[in-house]
Amino acid sequence: MEEAKRRDHNKLGREMKIFTTVDVIGQGLPLIMPNGVIMMQELQRWIEDEETKRGYIRTKTPLMAKSDLYKISGHWDHYKEGMFVLGDEETDKEVFALRPMTCPFQYYVYKAEQHSYRDLPLRYGETSTLFRNEDSGEMHGLTRVRQFTISEGHLIVRPDQMVKEFKDCIALAQYCLQVLGVEEDVTYHLSKWDPNNREKYIGDAEVWNQTEAHIRQMLEELNIPFTEDVGEAAFYGPKVDINAKNVYGKEDTMITIQWDALLAEQFDMYYIDENGEKQRPYIIHRTSMGCYERTLAWLIEKYAGMFPTWLCPEQVRVIPISEKFHNYAAKVEAQLKENGIRCSVDQRSEKMGYKIREARLARVPYMLIVGAKEEE
C-alpha cells in the first residue's frame, strides 16, 4: 500500500507539476501544467506521425453540434445522460451538445465527396477534445475526467477489408503499448452486447452475433488471450477493450477498437462498387493510444515519475560547480536546446550536493556538471 501511495498519479503528478485541480473550475476538469503539456505534446507528435506513416489522413471538426446530429447517430436516445446539453428542446429553437465522440463529424467528412470502392479504406484520424458528463463520485485525478483529449479515428472500409483493417488497428495499439513499455501490463476484452437488454442497442441479433464471432476469431488468430464481457459493448457494435489497472488495482480502459456494421446506414453512407452500384461500407472506431490524460496518469504510476528520456519534461540539467562557470553553462544549455534537448541551468548559490539532490528529486535523467575541465 505504501508503494501504491508513492506512485499514485493523483499525488505524484501534482508534486511533479504535471497537473493540478481547482475547486472553482470544477471536478473532472484538470489544469495541465507546463510539464504535463510537454509530455502530452510529445505523445501527440509521436502518435500523429505514426498514424500518418500508416495511411491516416487528418481532420479537424467542431467541439459541438446540434442535437439533430446525435439523433441520427442514436447517441441522443442511448447516451444523452452522458452528454453536456446546451439549451432546452421545449423552449429553444436549436439545442446543441458538446461532443462526447468524433465519429458523426468524420462521417460527414466522408459524405462531403462521392467515393469509389477503389478509394477504400479511408482512415481518418483526429486528436479530439471530448466532453462526457461523468458522475461526480467517479472523478479521480487524470483517469476519470469530464474533458479529455483522445487519439481518435474512424476507418471507412469495404466489408472484404474489415478483418485486415481491424487487425491492423490492433497492431497499431500494440506498437504504441510497446513503445511506452507497458505492453505486459494490459488485458484484452471482447465487449459484447447483452441480448437480454435489447433496448440498449441498435441492430438485430444476427448482426451482433456475426460481428462478435469475427472479433473472437481475430483475437484467437492473433494468439491474444482475452475475456468476454457481456453488456460492455457500445450501443452500435462490439469492441476490443484494452485495459490496465492503476496502483490500487482498479481497471480502466486505455484503448478501444470497435466493429460497426450499423451506423453507415444511419448516416446513409455509401461507396460505388465495381458495377456502379451503391454499397454500404463498414466502420472501425478506434484509438491508437486512447485518452492522453489517462495515459499520462498510467505512465506516472508505471514509472513513478522516472519517465523514458524522450518523454521527460526536463531531459538535462546543467550544474556549474561555481559562479565562475555560469557563462559556460549557459553556452552548453544553448547548444543543447539548438539540438532539441529540453534542459535548464541551475545557477543558484547552493552547494553542489544540494543541487544534485534537487535534480534527482525532480527526476531529471541527466545532469551535466561543468567546471574548468569541461570548459577547456
What would you call each of these model-derived segments?
Residues M1-E376:
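NTP/phosphate- and nucleic-acid-binding module
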